[in-house]
């Protein structure tokens, strides 16, 4: 399964730009790139210095939705052309920001999470 993962900061900026446009129009905001969920997981686990294969099962049909869309990728060419909008955050930045935000919710730093992750990987 592949998705067009984008950062909320890019989308909020794009929405603001759409609202400033001279007339009502339909726009698609997307990165125009799609990545597998495995790509996403690898990046997050890399930040934590973990081997994702020790924690994640892939290709198990029990975890697939019956009507799963295999690939979703947006075409933001209209927004890029008329609004001069483009995403500023790549998948690495998205993964990093999401992880750091979740850690903050738990009152943890990245270094604390890495220590816990290291202990878990030894089990």
Walk through the language-model features, giving the residues of each.
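C-terminal substrate-binding subdomain of Rossmann-fold SDR/epimerase-dehydratase oxidoreductases
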Residues: 1-123
């Amino acid at each position: 399964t592949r998705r067009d993962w984008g950062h909320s900061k890019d989308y909020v900026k794009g929405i603001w730009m759409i609202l400033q446009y001279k007339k009502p129009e339909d726009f698609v905001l997307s990165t125009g790139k799609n990545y597998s969920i495995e790509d996403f997981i690898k990046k997050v686990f890399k930040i934590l210095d973990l081997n994702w294969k020790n924690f994640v099962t892939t290709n198990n049909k029990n975890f697939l939705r019956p009507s799963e869309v295999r690939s979703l990728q947006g075409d933001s060419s209209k927004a890029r052309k008329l609004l001069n909008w483009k995403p500023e955050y790549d998948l690495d930045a998205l993964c990093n920001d999401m992880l750091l935000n979740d850690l903050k919710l738990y009152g943890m730093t990245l270094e604390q999470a890495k220590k816990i992750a290291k202990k878990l990987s030894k089990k």
